[in-house]
């Protein structure tokens, strides 16, 4: 698992509009990079809408927000449009970045095991160094936890 003090891995991923976002694009401001299992599921939708509703506060804290899952560009586009999301959703269909940061793991759900993204959030500094990690995210408290961390 990528941890505090590590450089976030380099990447180039498409967003919901088909534009390529490079890890270099994140430099110059802090970034929240949150990994989530799947578009249009209840908890993932709540999480995305929480970021949407608080984006202005994160902007005031000079912090960008990026969501990443294994969904396709088309699914991201539909999800973003349906919920009026105001930040980039990045496509990691082959799970390469998810594997590099250690969030693509064996999960148990309803007694079944399968590989998938474990909900995890990273905060990066202006040089893409990891300065905060939230593992096993609690969606209800995540936004306030992130704001409090960024205000310190």
Residue ranges and their predicted role:
Residues 1-152:
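Chalcogenol-based redox active-site neighborhoods
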């Amino acid at each position: 698992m990528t941890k505090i003090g590590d450089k976030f891995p380099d990447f180039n991923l498409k967003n919901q509009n088909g534009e390529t976002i490079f890890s270099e694009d994140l430099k110059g401001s802090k970034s929240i990079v949150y990994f989530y299992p799947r578009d249009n599921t209840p908890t993932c939708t709540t999480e995305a809408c929480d970021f949407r509703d608080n984006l202005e506060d994160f902007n005031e804290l000079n912090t960008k927000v990026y969501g990443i899952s294994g969904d396709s560009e088309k699914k991201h586009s539909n999800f973003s449009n349906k919920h009026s999301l105001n930040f980039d959703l990045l496509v990691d269909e082959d799970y390469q970045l998810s594997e590099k940061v250690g969030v693509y793991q064996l999960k148990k759900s309803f007694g079944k095991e399968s590989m998938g993204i474990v909900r995890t959030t990273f905060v990066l500094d202006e040089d893409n160094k990891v300065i905060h990690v939230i593992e096993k995210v609690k969606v209800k408290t995540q936004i306030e936890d992130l704001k409090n961390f960024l205000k310190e």
